[in-house]
Amino acid sequence: HILALDTAQEDCGAAILLADGSLFMHVEHVGSRHSERLLPMVRDLIHEAGIEKTDLGLIAFGEGPGSFTGLRVACGAAQGLAWALEVPVAQVSNLEALAEWLRETHLEAVRPGTRIAVLNDARMHECYAGMWRVPAAAEDRLERLDGPVLVAPEDAQTYLERFKADMLCGSGSKVYSEAMKIRSDGGIRMVNAADSHPDAIARIARRMALSGGTIRPELAHPVYVRNRVALTMAERAAGERL
């Protein structure tokens, strides 16, 4: 059984994927209260799934990019649980999780070779970007073509054209819609998506476990992308956020 944690954005999410494919998931909008809500959410999920904590065989978490504080919450919780249970960790790109969610929920539009772009709001007038290609076999993991990288909203159209994107999702296209000026005649299908997808993280983690992609808890780490990981006191007082 796999437990997946996602605290990369203002939502807090957790999911349990059982060995038989059954899924249990909770997602809440918590702002910056991830550290308060994550573990109670996990306890509720374990009870709902009808298992014991010791039945978990893998702990997965969204590695980022995303909110720096949020990423540390999920990473720390995953490490602590994995150490206590003596199980491995799978760290999954939050951008890939969005692409995987799109792949799973838009079967009528996704084909082998379809290129999925993800643009998430990175604040400071930037987006976290990544690009994936759908493989021929449905059971295989998405093929990463690029990312995660930082892209200015004004450069989004160029980025999408460079990698010949077929579909696009992520919060960046909503937050910076005017600056992006993505052409409606460009053949790119834009899909609205929620921020948190612990279910997709769990499914990717299952593929990682089968291919030997898990790690020891002490090796788990957030992926920030941006080097600037903290605000000054003045910036915090002014209401700025990373």
Range-by-range predicted roles:
Residues H1-E63:
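N-terminal beta-alpha supersecondary unit
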Residues H29-R37, F68-R72, G76, N192-S196:
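Residues at secondary-structure transition points
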Residues R33, P88-S196, Y224, V229-A230, ...:
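Surface "functional belts" at beta-alpha junctions
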Residues H47-T54, A82-V92, A109-R111:
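Phosphate-handling active-site elements
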Residues A60-N94:
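DPxDG-like acidic metal-binding loop motif
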Residues R189-L242:
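Acyltransferase
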